[in-house]
Structure formats: C-alpha cells, structure tokens
A protein has these predicted regions:
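Conserved AMP-binding A3 loop
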Residues: 66-70, 193-219
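AMP-binding/adenylate-forming catalytic core of the ANL superfamily
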Residues: 141, 416, 421-422, 444-529
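ANL superfamily adenylate-forming
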Residues: 61, 146-189, 293-330, 540
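Conserved AMP-binding/adenylation subdomain of ANL enzymes
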Residues: 216-233, 240-328, 338, 363
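Conserved pre-ATP/AMP-binding loop-to-beta segment of ANL
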Residues: 46-49, 176-197, 204, 227-233
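Conserved AMP-binding/adenylate-forming
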Residues: 279, 323, 327-453, 459-462, ...
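Conserved AMP-binding/adenylate-forming core of the ANL superfamily
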Residues: 30, 47-100, 104-108, 125-130, ...
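Conserved C-terminal "lid"/linker of ANL adenylate-forming enzymes
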Residues: 488-490, 521-553
Length: 553
C-alpha cells in the first residue's frame, strides 16, 4: 500500500482529533438510532439534569422542575407505551407548539413507538396547518395550549401537552402491561422517521423525509467537530420544528448537558437565571444582543475605551495571552456571566456580530446546511474559522462546486449520510436534486484551496444581466446591511437596473436618510460596475419573512 505523505497525515489528524484531545470525555459514540442514544444517556448521565423547567403555581409561586436523564428516558417510554395502548404506535403523529419539554417527549415517543413524527411550524396560518396535516397523513396532533381553539375542528386525535390528558397518558403507559411489546419494536435506522416541511408558502413547501441515521450521523459529526461538555447549559431558543433546532437539541442531549427554555424575549434574564453557557439562535436575535450591549457602552461613554481594550486583547492573544474574558467580564456578566459559545443558525450572520462576540471571549460560530441535509453541511469551530466563510465540511461530509464560473462560483453539491431520503411522494422533484448520490443544494458559492465554503446566494435568486454577467443579491445585501442605520434590505432587478428596498432602523440616533445615502455611495464604490445599485427606496415597514426570519423575495 502506498504511504501517504506525512503532511497529508498531519492535516487529517488535526481535522478529526484535535477536539477529541481537548475533551474530557474524548470518545463520542455514533449511535444507530435515537432510542439507543437516550437509553445510553439515561445510564451514563443518570442523575444529570436533562431539562430544567420553570413552573408557576396557582398562587404565583415560582418553582423549578429538574428532570434527570433517567426520568426523561422513562417518560418517553411511558408515552410510547401509551401510544401502543391507544393504537397510535407506528402511526404518524404531528406536534406543534412553543419549545417545551413535552414537545421533545412527544417527538421521541412517536419515534420509539415505531412511528413517524411530523413537527409543524408554530408560525403557520390555520389553513397551512390543515394542509400539512393532510399532506403528512398524520392521525394525531399534540399541541401547545395556544393552539387549543385553532385545532378544535380537526377530525384527528388531539392532545394538549399542557392539559391533564397528557399527564394521564404517561400514567397509562407506566401502568400498561406492554413492556415486552415496547421492547420488541424494531427501530429502523434507514426508514423515514421524521417528516419536515421546508419553510415557504404552502404550495412551495416540500415535505422532507429524514431517517434516524441522518440525524445521528449529523449529531456525531458535530460532537467531534466542536467541544461540548455535560457541564454546559443550553438555552433552547431555536424552534424545535426547525431542523437545526431539533438536531442541536439531540446533539446536546447526547453530550449530557442541561437544557432550559426562555420565556418570551427576556433572553438576558433567562441567561442569568440559568447560567447559560451555550446559546443557539437566529442572526437577528444574536444581533439584538450585541446592539443592546453596544447601546449601554455608548450611554456610559465607554465606546473608545472598549475599542482600545479590544485592540489590546487581540494583540495579546496573538502573543498567546488570552485575557478577553477577564478584560470584558462586565459585558459577559450582562449576559449571565457564563456564556462561552454562541451558535448562529437558520441564516447567515453579520461579520460584525461574529467579530464582536469573538473579541470579548465568547466563541461565535456559524455553519451552513439545509433541511434536506439534516441540516449541517459545514461549520466553523474554535480552531477553524475564516472571514466571510461558513467553515469547513464537518467530518464525513463531502462538498464540491458544480459547473464553476471564472470566479470559481457555482452550485454547491454535497454527499454524506446526512442527506435526506427524498421529498415525500414527489419522486420527480427528488430526482432533480439528488443525482448520482450527490445533493444539489440550490445555493451558489465557492470553496477555497483550504476547503472553506463561501455562500454567494440562492441559485434561483441570481440576477442574469443582458451582458451575461451574474449578480448575487445576497452578496450585495451583506455589504448594505453593515450600516447601523439600516435594519434590513432586499436587492432586486428591473431589467438591467439593480435596485434595493431598505428598511431604516428606527433606533438609529441621527439622520438615518443622510447616513443611508452616504453608505450607499460607499457600497457602490466597493462594487464592480455591473453590480452597482442604480436606485433605492427607504421604507418604515419590515419585509415579509418566513418563520425562520428569512426575507420572502
């Protein structure tokens, strides 16, 4: 056998083992299915707190329900055995509602009972809920209390996860004489287990079929790509119905950490209350955290002082001296005092946001993926970050650029065990995106010589001018959104004229229109002639968005 050059071996070893050497528990396990994972965690992390849930009594008294991994595993089993008793085992069960402990129990119980779970977006309109229930062929719906009136007329089994009926099902399963039947349920690793609808209008949403191997593979790859500890506390803010929200929760459970929920938008209060160490959120929420900190700094007249401190700490870090968390302790204390990592999902993050958190000693990373890839394809980690990129492919994933242009930009295609089974009952649509074992993402990007991926935008959004030149709207929007006077924008074309709609930030202090005008002149100076903005309009109303916060084009 031909020996690999030493330099190649070194690169390979660094990619796959650096995180493991730093981790106390350095042997992560690749689980065959989720039941194996939960049962293993119930033993390994038996008395660890899996979920800490705030409860408000009738007298207004606050208490906390600390649910251990052992209890969590038992309650999943009890609900799954209740499904056997009620004829729901092996069936399709939908769940809708805010992030909650009960939501996760329903999700896993449906899977453990040999069925298919159908997570529904809680931002859907009534007719969209009805449509997706019909398309998924769900026979039961578990819902949060806020949906009680909205789902009352649906002719399927309905259970409110916040009513006594749900807790009665746990008791029913516990007392049922069907333990052997439950234990004998065969868990398939490669059959459809999760049916997820992509965001968009009802007519455009696609039902994505995922198997357990898709999820456990992505979990495992992420667990060896970044450092996660059983002592971590995760604030589960990203919606569970979103693939990344679902996968990262399963990932964090596999690592034995504690998971907590945020009430409303009181993020800073919750982070302080629970001692949150890891926070996963959409870009807008992370950006608002940064803006809130900057607003306090400005009000205290400390802007120049902080900027100088950041320059000093960055210089020291280059010399191997990291004093960021000590130097910016007051800022970190304002976010609970223990925050060590911010993970940004669902959309691309502003470079300013990533730079801010990393400058104060909180690791801020982002990745790239789709519902169809369970979802992570690439990600940054503590030692692999590069400006404007979405990181390297996570272990076990391949990616390449299809039909690149003169700038190396083309469609990103990927291959790995995280790739979906297909679109439910849409074989022709599936064949359009899965070819010869490769998934065609519909995203345009490039990959540099070191393997870092850079996203330019969606293939369907690209503007092709009459001279044959391509303009990528998202690329220009990233530059435009750097202005503090601009909240959001959308770039589009009318003929060969590149235009832009801008939403001004109402909290901007100063003349927003003048600031925007100056910034747009700067933007055009940075762009090649055919990409320049010919005209723009400023509006007060926000753009229409999907439930994951992406602007609808």
């Amino acid at each position: 056998m031909t020996k690999l050059p030493k330099c190649v071996k070194l690169v390979f070893d660094t990619r796959l083992t650096r995180n493991q050497k730093r981790r106390k528990n350095n042997m992560r396990k690749k689980y065959s299915h989720l039941k194996e994972m939960i049962e293993d965690c119930a033993v390994k992390y038996e008395n660890n707190i899996a979920f800490k849930v705030k409860k408000t009594g009738e007298n207004g008294k606050i208490s906390y329900d600390e649910i251990t991994y052992a209890r969590f595993a038992k309650e999943i089993e009890y609900l799954a055995r209740s499904f056997i008793e009620t004829g729901l085992a092996g069936k399709r069960i939908a769940v809708i509602g805010k992030n909650s402990y009960e939501w996760i129990v329903v999700f896993l119980a449906a899977v453990f009972a040999g069925g298919v779970i159908v997570p529904l977006d809680r931002g859907l309109l009534d007719f969209e809920i009805a449509d997706q229930l019909k398309r998924s062929e769900a026979v039961a719906l578990f819902y949060g209390a806020e949906f009680k009136d909205r789902v009352a007329d649906y002719d399927i089994v309905k259970v409110c996860t916040e009513d006594k009926e749900f807790s009665d099902m746990l008791v029913q399963g516990k007392e049922a004489d069907n333990k052997k039947e439950y234990d004998s349920i065969k868990i398939s690793t490669h059959d459809m287990t999760v049916l997820l609808f992509t965001s968009g209008t009802t007519s455009a949403s696609k039902a994505v079929m995922l198997c357990q191997n898709n999820i456990t593979f992505d979990m495992y790859a992420m667990s060896i790509w970044e450092n996660f500890y059983e002592t971590d506390v995760n604030m589960a803010l990203l919606p569970f119905h979103h693939t990344f929200g679902m996968m990262q929760t399963m990932l964090f459970l596999s690592c034995g950490m504690c998971n907590v929920f945020c009430e409303g938008l009181r993020i800073a209060k919750c982070m302080n209350e629970y001692g949150v160490t890891i926070f996963v959120g959409v870009p807008r929420i992370i950006e608002e955290m940064m803006l809130a900190v900057n607003k306090k700094i400005t009000a205290q007249g400390k802007t120049k002082k902080i900027q100088t401190a950041i320059k000093l700490s960055n210089a020291l870090k280059k010399c191997g001296i990291d004093v960021r968390r000590k130097m910016f302790k007051q800022i970190i204390d304002g976010m609970g005092g223990k925050l060590r990592m911010v993970i940004i999902g669902a959309a691309a993050a502003s470079p300013d946001v990533l730079k801010f958190f990393n400058s104060i000693g909180v690791l801020a990373i982002q990745g790239y993926g789709l519902t169809e890839t369970s979802p992570v394809i690439s990600a940054e980690n503590h030692s692999h970050r590069r400006k404007d990129s979405v990181g390297l492919t996570i272990p076990g994933i391949e990616a390449r650029i299809d039909n690149p242009d003169e700038n190396g930009i083309g469609e990103i295609v990927t291959k790995g065990e995280n790739m979906m089974l297909g679109y439910y009952k849409e074989p022709e649509l599936t064949a359009e995106v899965i070819k010869d074992g490769w998934f065609y993402t519909g995203d345009l990007g490039r990959i540099d010589k070191d393997g870092y991926i850079y996203i330019c935008g969606r293939k369907k959004n690209v503007i092709v001018l009459s001279n044959g030149k391509n303009v990528y709207p998202e690329e220009i929007e990233t530059i435009i959104n750097l202005s503090p006077a601009i909240k959001e924008c959308i770039v589009y074309a009318e003929g060969d004229d590149i235009r832009c709609k801008i939403v001004a930030d109402e909290e901007f202090e100063g003349d927003a229109n003048e600031s925007i005008a100056q910034h747009m002149s700067y933007v055009n100076e940075q762009l090649i002639y055919y990409k320049r903005i010919n005209s723009y309009t400023v509006q007060d109303t926000e753009m229409a968005k999907t439930t994951t916060g992406k602007i609808k084009r």
